[in-house]
UniProtKB/Swiss-Prot annotation:
The lineage of its organism: Bacteria, Bacillati, Cyanobacteriota, Cyanophyceae, Synechococcales. The record marks H164, E213 as: Could be important to modulate the pK values of the two catalytic cysteine residues. Homodimer. It catalyses: (2S,6S)-2,6-diaminopimelate = meso-2,6-diaminopimelate. It is found in: Cytoplasm. It comes from Synechocystis sp. (strain ATCC 27184 / PCC 6803 / Kazusa). One of its GO terms (cellular component) is cytosol. The keyword RNA-binding does not apply. This is Diaminopimelate epimerase.
Length: 279
C-alpha cells in the first residue's frame, strides 16, 4: 500500500507524521514503522507519530513507535511536531490542542512566533513511579550511586510519563554515548528500561545535555529529557527552575513552575517534506 506521510523535526529529533484520524489504531505495525525509520532503506527518522481521534474529550490522540519498534509513553519533541502537523492540516497558525497520550493529557500551544509551548505536566519522583529499584518505594532517587561501565555515577531519576535517569558530568562532549548509553538503558535497576541524560552545568540558568533515548539511541534533542534535566538540576541544587537547555540540535526553554508544579517547554517544530512510501 502507499502511505502518505509528512516529515517534521524538533531540533533535529525527526519524525514521520501520519494522518491516522480515520481509525483508533495505528495504520502501521511496529515492524513497518521500524522499516520506515531506517535511514538507509527507509525514510529515516527517530520515530513514527500517528494522529488518531481524541479520547475522553481531547482533540486528538498521539501514538508513537520508536525506530526500534517499541512504543514510548510520550515524546516532548514529538508532541511539538504533532501540534505543528495538525495545525498545518487544519490551516491554522495559532491554536492550543489537548492531546491524549499514554502519559496522560498534554497541551501544546502554537505561538505567534512559530514556537510551540507545551504544558508537560507534573514530574513524578518516587522510585516506584519511574520505575526503578534504586530506592525503596515511596522514596526519591536523588544523587544516588549507580554502577555502570566500571564506574559509579551519581544519578537522579524523574518520570515525565516516561523514565529518565540523569547524571551530571564535567564535560558532556567527552562521553562515548554509543558505548555507555545502552548500559544505562538496559540496566537491571530499570524494569522498563530508561532514557539517560548526561548534563553539564554552564550556569544556574543554562544546562548542556546529551541524551541516549530508550528505543532510539543517540538523538539530537529530547523534550521530556530537557524537562527532567531541569527537575534534576533543581533537586540537586545545581540549577534554577527556569533554564535554557542546550542540546546538540538547538535550545529548549524549560520552566518548572513553583505555583502549579508543572513543567512548561518551549521550542520549535518544523516541516521538512511530505511524500508517499510503499509499505
Amino acid at each position: 500500500m502507499a502511505l502518505s506521510f509528512s516529515k517534521y523535526h524538533g531540533l533535529g529529533n525527526d519524525f514521520i507524521l501520519v494522518d491516522n484520524r480515520q481509525s483508533t489504531e495505528p495504520c502501521l505495525t511496529p515492524d513497518q514503522a521500524q522499516q520506515l525509520c531506517d535511514r538507509h532503506f527507509g525514510i529515516g527518522a527517530d520515530g513514527v507519530i500517528f494522529a488518531l481521534p481524541g479520547q475522553g474529550g481531547t482533540d486528538y490522540t498521539m501514538r508513537i513507535f520508536n525506530s526500534d519498534g517499541s512504543e514510548p509513553e510520550m515524546c516532548g519533541n514529538g508532541i511539538r511536531c504533532l501540534a505543528k502537523f495538525l495545525a498545518d492540516l487544519e490551516g491554522v497558525e495559532e491554536k492550543t490542542y489537548r492531546i491524549h497520550t499514554l502519559a496522560g493529557v498534554i497541551t501544546p500551544q502554537l505561538l505567534a512566533d512559530g514556537q510551540v509551548k507545551v504544558d508537560m505536566g507534573e514530574p513524578q519522583l518516587l522510585a516506584e513511579l519511574i520505575p526503578t529499584t534504586l530506592a525503596p518505594a515511596g522514596e526519591k532517587v536523588v544523587d544516588l550511586p549507580l554502577a555502570v561501565a566500571g564506574q559509579t555515577w551519581a544519578v537522579t531519576c524523574v518520570s515525565m510519563g516516561n523514565p529518565h535517569c540523569l547524571t551530571f558530568v564535567d564535560d558532556v562532549d567527552s562521553l562515548n554515548l554509543t558505548e555507555i548509553g545502552p548500559l544505562f538503558e538496559h540496566h537491571p535497576q530499570f524494569s522498563q528500561r530508561t532514557n539517560t541524560e548526561f548534563i553539564q552545568v554552564l550556569g544556574s540558568d543554562r544546562l548542556k545535555m546529551r541524551v541516549w533515548e530508550r528505543g532510539a539511541g543517540i538523538t539530537l534533542a529530547c523534550g521530556t529529557g530537557a524537562c527532567a534535566t531541569v527537575v534534576a538540576a533543581v533537586l540537586t541544587g545545581r540549577g534554577d527552575r527556569r533554564c535554557t537547555v542546550e542540546l546538540p540540535g538547538g535550545n529548549l526553554e524549560i520552566e518548572w513552575s513553583a505555583q502549579d508544579n508543572r513543567l512548561y517547554m518551549t521550542g520549535p517544530a518544523q516541516r521538512v517534506f511530505s511524500g508517499q512510501a510503499e509499505i
